[in-house]
Amino acid sequence: MSVIVPIHGPAIAPAPAPERVGVLLVNLGTPDSCDTKGVRIYLREFLSDPRVIENQGLFWKLALNGIILNTRPARKAKDYQKIWNHEKNESPLKTITRAQAEKLSASLGDRGHLIVDWAMRYGNPSLRDRIEALVAKGCTRLLVVPLYPQYSAATSATVCDQAFRVLRELRAQPTLRVTPPYYRDSAYIDALATSIKSHLASLTFEPELIVASFHGMPQAYIDKGDPYQAQCVATVEALRERMGVADDKLLLTFQSRFGFDQWLQPYTDKTIEALARKGVRKLAVVMPGFSADCLETLEEIAQENAEIFMEHGGEEFTAIPCLNDSDAGVQVIRQLVLRELQGWL
């Protein structure tokens, strides 16, 4: 009588779960709280990124830890408190980015294999946390969407850096795509033009001209080859053409300079002061480089720069809201996402 001996081979791996696609919207970041401690934690992470401050040598580290993190957080905390969403206990940037993700998900319709999420490069929810969460939900393909219309190494590139740091630690990595900058995308330019015209139509005064203010950066970064300035110029040129306005009726400036190095010029605050001194009495400012309202738009422009304008002779000032989670703003993101998801849906 023969005996059948069982053969013990390697365990058979379970069948793979249905593949899902993750879409991750990413913006710059925000403190978890508007007190000095929360702002200090945020600034330490932000200013320790070599993409943001390229010279991370001993002098910078001494200045950061010995001076900046002991003086700047208290001042910036007061600024955050002016714009803080106290109902949700979070910054407007977090509120708006969440809404953008939720509305984008709804706009994409019933696609059970598609998951939309959002993250911040600095602060929370972190890129690491949300990428790991998407992978845990079965996402084998991931589209990262830096919410910066204009590319810069200090914004878009550092998002990619951090995403790859997270993937480097995963055995089963998702396939990764990153959306490109959309600084002259027709949907983006159309949305900006429509938003500007709609806001101006709601005013009780007519601005004499519009200032398009972009976040600044050190001139040295541009000299090293960063395309950011050229893309800002391209955005304003396309917007002028779309709106049919002359160059001197839609000016390009740069805000938020920090430290003692030369930054991109002309500076927004100096330009606004000069315009008021020259007799401009009614002014509008739009911030095309920001996909969502944040400290730099709601406090720096809408409050600080408004005060500068009024103190030097201005009479009427308006800060035009960013596209935010408006229908047009979400449509810009939706079109960008669908274009980059081709072959995955």
From Swiss-Prot:
GO terms for biological process: heme biosynthetic process. InterPro entries: Ferrochelatase, Ferrochelatase_AS, Ferrochelatase_C, Ferrochelatase_N. The keyword Cytoplasm applies. It catalyses: heme b + 2 H(+) = protoporphyrin IX + Fe(2+). Fe cation binds at H215, E296. Its EC number is 4.98.1.1. GO terms for cellular component: cytoplasm. Coiled coil: none annotated. It comes from the Bacteria. The keyword Zinc does not apply. It is an enzyme of class 4 (lyase). It is found in: Cytoplasm. Keywords: Cytoplasm, Heme biosynthesis, Iron, Lyase, Metal-binding, Porphyrin biosynthesis. Gene3D superfamilies: 3.40.50.1400. It holds the Pfam family Ferrochelatase. NCBIfam families: hemH (TIGR00109). Catalyzes the ferrous insertion into protoporphyrin IX. This is Ferrochelatase.
